[in-house]
Amino acid sequence: MSETLRFDPIYSEHAIERCAWTVFFTQPLPEKLYGNVTQAAGDGAQERGFQPVAFRGIQFNAITGQVVSGQASGGPVEFVTPDGAQQLSITPQSVSFASTRYVRWTPFFGQVSDLPLKVAERFVDVVSVSALKVEYWDRFIWSGEWSDFDPNKLLRGDNQYAAPGAVRGGNAWHSHVGWFERTEGAVRRLVNINIDAVDFLRPNTIGPKPSIGVYTTIQDAFFLPGSLQVDVGIEAIKTRSTEIHNDLKSLLGQIILDDMQSRISLNSGARADVR
């Protein structure tokens, strides 16, 4: 019986629950320019079927003492598709795009280039890029129960990124590791890996199943206070984004077993086009 138990990716061709791309800037845009940028971004987003998300807050009039609800100027702006699967977020100091409808990197980054990157270009005309981040959330579902849960059927025995004490726990657990490293073309790189064993409820199923979620992210910093700054333009952001994506693929390959890598075609076949 135990030999039939296994992990399955959340989707038939890949395990990606969510992917996100974010570019950060060294300082916020001036308020008036930020308003112009978000207005243009909103028009473009709604042309593409996105809907604005209303942020409600409280504003205080120092003269009259009146407290009113509403959104303060210069605050975050967000647009989502009607099904909530895709999200464009803009703040005075960042632009982010996320999707739970990930198919493969090329169309995902095509969507980034279609609008979010154009918004970022308006920022780059005025302020410098401080960092670029790409994130992946992968999910694998256990076919059995917690009583027979075996993370060793997914995670490599020689992987350095899951705390041994957590993996031996047998029940729900969390492992987190992160480090800085040097990388060419940036001031420094931050790598983070979270591995969680938790209940997961699939749509149209009865009761949750044990699962392992693997969150991987790489953030390249191009500016740090007191250090040198690396000038980065839009074309460099495009190239760097794909480089980070490929490095994250390699990182996942160091975490999961070869059998699962083959099932999701991580580095060849369909997966090469998917991820």
Positions of the model-derived regions?
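Long, compositionally biased interface segments
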Residues: 210-275
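Short amphipathic alpha-helical segments
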Residues: 33, 37, 104-111, 115, ...
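Hydrophobic alpha-helical segments and helix pairs
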Residues: 83-125
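N-terminal low-complexity, intrinsically disordered segments
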Residues: 1-90, 239, 266-275
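Short glycine-rich, low-complexity/disordered patches
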Residues: 51-63, 121-139, 167-172, 247-275
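Aromatic/basic-lined ligand-recognition segments
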Residues: 6-9, 74-80, 129-219
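Glycine-rich, often proline-containing surface loops adjacent to acidic residues and nearby aromatics
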Residues: 15-22, 86-102, 128-137, 211-227
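Short, solvent-exposed segments of well-ordered alpha helices
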Residues: 8, 99-103, 231, 235
